[in-house]
Amino acid sequence: MYGYEDKTYNEVLTQAVNNIEEINQAVDAICEKGYKNLYLVGTGGTYAMASPLSYLIKTNSTIPWYYEIAAELVTAKPKQLTKDSVVITASLSGTTVETINAAKYAKEVGATVIVLVGEKECPLTEYADYVFENRTASNDNLVEEIYIQYFALGARFMKNNGEFPE
């Protein structure tokens, strides 16, 4: 693989795994408060990266969910996106305009917003209730980092929904 470095790759995966306890705490707090549905929102690559989580929820859960392109979410203004919704999105740079606009719109309707970013100090986090940062991530290893954290989020929502009996 071009540009592959064991050390960097391991750092990225370790940081993503290290975020899981904080992810679990955030999801537990959201579930305790109550929510109606999940929105998986992205732009370009981060939209594509949410596809496996979308499939996991579709095939293994009764949680109501939506899988949306960020710009379309803002344009369509779905009626199901409310103060009782949870929006999950990601942007390595935190400067993707469409993703920022989607998070801003979600906050305007009162939704809870979870974001995954490379750096906490970025425009996207202005509209986030929960921020999970991975400073070691880059475009070369973003997929693995996002997958780990997306699956941690999805699994915890599903666990709290009673879908993992053990």
Segment roles from a protein language model:
Residues 36-165:
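Glycine-rich phosphate-binding loops that contact phosphosugars or nucleotide phosphates
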Residues 2-36, 138-142, 153-166:
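Active-site phosphate/pyrophosphate-binding segments
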